[in-house]
Amino acid sequence: MRVVRPEFRPAPGLDTDAMASRQRDIAAVADFADDHGLTPERIGLDEPPGEQAALGGATTSGEAAPVVVGVDQAFRDDEVSVSAAVAIRDGAVIERAAGNAPLDVPYVPGLLAFREGSAVIDALSSLSVEPDLLVVDGSGRIHYRQAGLATHVGVLFDVPAVGVAKSLLCGTPAAALADPLPAGTRVAIEADDSMDAPDGAVVGYALQSRQYPTPETRHINPLYVSPGHRVSAGTAADLVEATCTQYKLPAPTRLADQYAADLT
C-alpha cells in the first residue's frame, strides 16, 4: 500500500493542541459518504476464516472478490507499539503484515492515532495486496474531532475504512443501552456537544453482533461501528455485521488481534 496524504503522517514532537488541529484537518478531508463498490453480500463470510490453514489458499470467486484488511494493535514491554494487518479475500487469509514503532506519545483519549498510527502505517505499507476495505480496531467518526484512528488511516491511504470500537468514546445513543440488546439490534450514535459534528448527526451505530441465549444472566456488549473514510455510517454497520460470522468481533479484526498477540 502507498501513502497518498503524507502530510497527515503522525509527526513527532507535536503538542496536544497541534494534534487536535491536525485531526480537524483530517476530518475536513474525510468522506463520510459511500464511495466504493462494496456490499455486505460481496464481503460476507458464511464461516469464520482460519488464520494459518487458509493463508495463501485459493478462493472460490477469483481475483474479483474484495480484499478486506483487519488492523489491530498491541504493545511490547510498554515501549513499542505493534500493529498487525490481516488481509482476507473470499473467506481466505491471503496475507499478513506487521509493523512497529516506539511508544513516544503518552496515552490521551482521542489522540491514539498519534500514539499507535506509525506502527499501523508501517504494517499497511508492507502489504503487497491493495485493500478494498480497512476494518480498524478503534474509532472512526465517533470521535471528538471526527478523526479517530480509522479515519486517520483511511484518509492517509485514501482507502474505504470503518472503525470498530469496544467502548463508546463520545456521542449519545439514540436509545438506552443499559439493558442487553438482542442480536442484530442497531442503535444510532448521535453527535453531541462533546464533538465537532453537528448536534444530532448520526456518526455511527451501536451494533449488537451477537448475544447469549439468556442475556439476563450473561450478556455480550455491543460494538461501536463508525465510518472512517469513503463509507457511510449505515453501510459501515452493514459491512461489519456481514463479517461477524459466529463471533462478536468481525473476522478481519479478530484475526488481526490474534496475529498481534503472536507478535508480542
Curated annotation (Swiss-Prot):
CDD domains (alphabetical): Endonuclease_V
Catalyzed reaction equations: Endonucleolytic cleavage at apurinic or apyrimidinic sites to products with a 5'-phosphate
Main EC class the enzyme belongs to: hydrolase
Record-linked InterPro entries: Endonuclease-V
Molecular function via GO: deoxyribonuclease V activity; magnesium ion binding; RNA endonuclease activity, producing 5'-phosphomonoesters; single-stranded RNA binding
Keyword field contains Magnesium: yes
Site (Interaction with target DNA): Y107
Subcellular localization, as worded in the UniProt entry: Cytoplasm
This protein's UniProt keywords: Cytoplasm, DNA damage, DNA repair, Endonuclease, Hydrolase, Magnesium, Metal-binding, Nuclease
Gene3D superfamilies: archaeoglobus fulgidus dsm 4304 superfamily (3.30.2170.10)
GO cellular component: cytoplasm
One Pfam family recorded for the sequence: Endonuclease_5
GO BP term (any one): DNA repair
Enzyme Commission (EC) number: 3.1.21.7
Taxonomic superkingdom: Archaea
Binding site for Mg(2+): D72, D137
Cofactor(s), names only, from the UniProt record: Mg(2+)
Function, as annotated: DNA repair enzyme involved in the repair of deaminated bases. Selectively cleaves double-stranded DNA at the second phosphodiester bond 3' to a deoxyinosine leaving behind the intact lesion on the nicked DNA.
UniProt similarity note: Belongs to the endonuclease V family.
Protein's recorded name: Endonuclease V
Species whose genome carries this gene: Halobacterium salinarum (strain ATCC 700922 / JCM 11081 / NRC-1) (Halobacterium halobium)
Taxon lineage: Archaea, Methanobacteriati, Methanobacteriota, Stenosarchaea group, Halobacteria
